[in-house]
């Protein structure tokens, strides 16, 4: 195969030449490499430079770039796997070319995950991670990282696929990115607790074309019970902006307290925090020390996540303003007004028009209408 040299972060590697006229790289490339996922990989390098696990598994290596970067930029022992022998040959060549050491395996991901355990396991499949989640939850000793690019099923745009893959009820709302992230996290949590293990989110976020989880696995039935307690449902009114969340593994009938419409259940999904605040501080401190091409974007992401409320939904600022009527002030003014009146309020990291708050609708209306 014809190869070209690429540098990402501090790592130089080779990838197959891809047809620039191809609508999507896998249709033309013998080994897949997606340059649009650079921020995803930068986030992994940044986080691992803080966590420093004993060993890291890149379960679906492809070109091997993620594992290569972890080995070279974090100095962490790596195992890079891909079931395609051509990909494995390229990974070995890239390791040798970069002067790095690492174990390369050529196996079905589920077979490898079922046979061996690793301190940190990273799932970055093409599409849904659902077929690999069970084995990954058993294989990960301390850390489990998951990428999902099947955002349409997770966010409710492809409802039946979301139900089939994740055994949950998504809904395509204005806060669909939040729903998708929490459904994915809830699915992994429900898988983990089957083995009397729990989890805690370390650094989870939604981007334009993927969802990314960085999780810490916890041992024991008590940890599993704490994890179950963080699962629940979001109830959405289809007739007005009212919504509410409720912990529990089974949905209940809810009637909108504002308009009397039967509310729609979303879930089960994860309720509560999506990140560890102390860890975000450590990552922000480490960020300037790494040569990351998406340093600025990551810095902004960390800043927003640090103050973002853990509510499981948001109000789209334009929609809520239209519902209330009038000409609203800037979103930051409304956030400040809500905070001044004793409520919590923030932006969301995945949308510039998202307003997150624990204030009731009447208080939001007052903040929007005040002169």
Swiss-Prot record:
Residues 4-368 form the Trm1 methyltransferase domain. Keywords: Metal-binding, Methyltransferase, RNA-binding, S-adenosyl-L-methionine, Transferase, tRNA processing, tRNA-binding, Zinc. Zn(2+) binds at residues 237, 240, 256, 259. GO terms for biological process: tRNA N2-guanine methylation. It is an enzyme of class 2 (transferase). Its EC number is 2.1.1.216. InterPro entries: SAM-dependent_MTases_sf, Trm1, TRM1_arc_bac, tRNA_met_Trm1_C. Pfam families: TRM (PF02005). S-adenosyl-L-methionine binds at residues 41, 66, 82, 108-109. Transmembrane segments: none annotated. Dimethylates a single guanine residue at position 26 of a number of tRNAs using S-adenosyl-L-methionine as donor of the methyl groups. Belongs to the class I-like SAM-binding methyltransferase superfamily. Trm1 family. This is tRNA (guanine(26)-N(2))-dimethyltransferase. It comes from Methanosphaerula palustris (strain ATCC BAA-1556 / DSM 19958 / E1-9c).
